[in-house]
From Swiss-Prot:
Protein location: Cytoplasm
Binding site for ATP: 67-74
Family according to the record: Belongs to the RecA family.
Species name: Chlamydia muridarum (strain MoPn / Nigg)
Function noted in UniProt: Can catalyze the hydrolysis of ATP in the presence of single-stranded DNA, the ATP-dependent uptake of single-stranded DNA by duplex DNA, and the ATP-dependent hybridization of homologous single-stranded DNAs. It interacts with LexA causing its activation and leading to its autocatalytic cleavage.
Cross-referenced PANTHER family: MITOCHONDRIAL DNA REPAIR PROTEIN RECA HOMOLOG-RELATED, RECA
GO cellular component: cytosol
Gene: recA
GO BP terms in the entry: DNA recombination; DNA repair; SOS response
Keywords assigned: ATP-binding, Cytoplasm, DNA damage, DNA recombination, DNA repair, DNA-binding, Nucleotide-binding, SOS response
One GO MF term: damaged DNA binding
Protein name: Protein RecA
Length: 354
C-alpha cells in the first residue's frame, strides 16, 4: 500500500471511530493538551515535592501512601488536602478507620468547615462514594483512609473467624477498574492510605507487603513508602516530633526511588521551615559552621530549632530561600540534561567513526 493510500485508510478509520464512539475518542497525542500539562498539589514538604520530580502529587491519578503505624501517613495526606483547599479546590475524606481528628486536621491547615467527610459502613460503599465524587468533577482530591479498613460487605455480615479468601482484593480490583478512568477524565486526585503486613514463611527478601491485593500497586501512578527514622528532641529532652523518610517506590511521571527526609512536629504537622533549612544547607545556600547557621553575612541562629523559629517569623527570608532552592534545582537539572546531550553526541560521533 502506497503512502497516500495508507493516509486515506487511516483518515477513514478515524472518521468511522469518531462516528461510532464520539468526537475526540481518538486523536493525535500532540493535539491532546492534557497529555502535556500535569496539575499538581503540593505535599507540604518541599524535599518531597522535589523528590517526586513534578512539584507535588499529580491530579487525575491514583496515589498510594503506605508505611507502618504512626509513620505520618494521615498527616501527609491531610497536608495535601489543606494545600488543595488553599488552591481553591474541594477535598473529600473517606474515613473508613473512623479515626480522623478534626482538631489536628485544622491545626495542620485544613478547612474542616469545607472538608467533606464520609464514614461508610463497608468497603463497597466507600469505593462507590469515591467514584461518585470523582464522577461529579467538582472534587479535586479524595483521601481514602485506609485500604485495610475497607471491609467487604459479605465479611461484615459473616461471623468472626469465617475465612474470606481474596474478597478485599477482588473488591479493590473491580473498583479501581472503574475509578481510574473517572479520575483521569475529571482531573481528580485519589489518595489511598495503606498499612503494611508481613508475609508468613519468607526467609529471604523483604517480608513486608501491603493490604488489598496487587491491583492498587498496578493502578497507582505514585507509591510513597513513609517511615519514622528518629525522634526530634526539644527542651528537657522531651520528644517534640519525628524525623520522617519517604521513598518514592513507584513513579510513572518522573524517575522513581528518590528519597526525601523531613520533620513532623506533634502540634504543627510537617515543618516547612525544617525542609527549607535542610535543602538550603545541602545546596550550600546556608552555611553551617558547627551549630551556627549563616546566610550571606547574616547569622540566622545557633541550633536548628532557633533557625526554624527565625524562618517562621521572617516570611520574606523563608520565601527568598525557597526561591533560591528552586533556582539551584533547575540549574542542576539543566546541567544534567546538557551533560546527557553531550554524552549522547559523543557516542554518536564514536559510532560514526567506526
Amino acid at each position: 500500500m502506497s503512502v497516500p493510500d495508507r493516509k486515506r485508510a487511516l483518515e477513514a478509520a478515524i472518521a468511522y471511530i469518531e462516528k461510532q464512539f464520539g468526537a475526540g475518542s481518538i486523536m493525535s497525542l500532540g493535539k491532546h493538551s492534557s497529555a502535556h500539562e500535569i496539575s499538581t498539589i503540593k505535599t507540604g514538604a518541599l524535599s518531597l515535592d522535589l523528590a517526586l520530580g513534578i512539584g507535588g502529587v499529580p491530579k487525575g491519578r491514583i496515589i498510594e501512601i503506605f508505611g507502618p503505624e504512626s509513620s505520618g501517613k494521615t498527616t501527609l495526606a491531610t497536608h495535601i488536602v489543606a494545600n488543595a483547599q488553599k488552591m481553591g479546590g474541594v477535598a473529600a475524606y473517606i474515613d473508613a478507620e473512623h479515626a480522623l481528628d478534626p482538631n489536628y486536621a485544622a491545626l495542620i491547615g485544613a478547612n474542616i468547615n469545607d472538608l467533606m467527610i464520609s464514614q461508610p459502613d463497608c468497603g463497597e460503599d466507600a469505593l462507590s462514594i469515591a467514584e461518585l465524587l470523582a464522577r461529579s468533577g467538582a472534587v479535586d482530591v479524595i483521601v481514602i483512609d485506609s485500604v485495610a479498613a475497607l471491609v467487604p460487605k459479605s465479611e461484615l455480615e459473616g461471623e468472626i473467624g469465617d475465612v474470606h479468601v481474596g474478597l478485599q482484593a477482588r473488591m479493590m480490583s473491580q473498583a479501581l477498574r472503574k475509578l481510574t478512568a473517572t479520575l483521569a477524565r475529571t482531573n481528580t486526585c485519589a489518595i489511598f492510605i495503606n498499612q503494611i503486613r508481613e508475609k508468613i514463611g519468607v526467609s529471604f527478601g523483604n517480608p513486608e507487603t501491603t493490604t488489598g491485593g496487587r491491583a492498587l500497586k498496578f493502578y497507582s501512578s505514585i507509591r510513597m513508602d513513609i517511615r519514622r527514622i528518629g525522634a526530634i528532641k526539644g527542651g528537657e529532652n522531651f520528644d517534640i516530633g519525628n524525623r520522617i523518610k519517604v521513598k518514592v517506590a513507584k513513579n510513572k511521571l518522573a524517575p522513581p526511588f528518590r528519597t526525601a527526609e523531613f520533620d513532623i512536629l506533634f502540634n504543627e504537622g510537617i515543618s516547612s521551615a525544617g525542609c527549607i533549612i535542610d535543602l538550603a544547607v545541602e545546596k550550600n545556600i546556608i552555611d553551617k559552621k558547627g551549630s551556627w547557621f549563616n546566610y550571606q553575612d547574616r547569622k540566622l541562629g545557633q541550633g536548628r530549632e532557633a533557625v526554624r523559629e527565625e524562618l517562621k517569623r521572617n516570611k520574606e527570608l523563608f520565601q527568598e530561600l525557597e526561591r533560591r532552592i528552586y533556582e539551584s534545582v533547575q540549574a542542576s537539572s539543566s546541567q544534567a540534561l546538557a551533560s546527557a546531550c553531550l554524552d549522547q553526541e559523543a557516542r554518536e560521533v564514536a559510532e560514526a567513526a567506526k
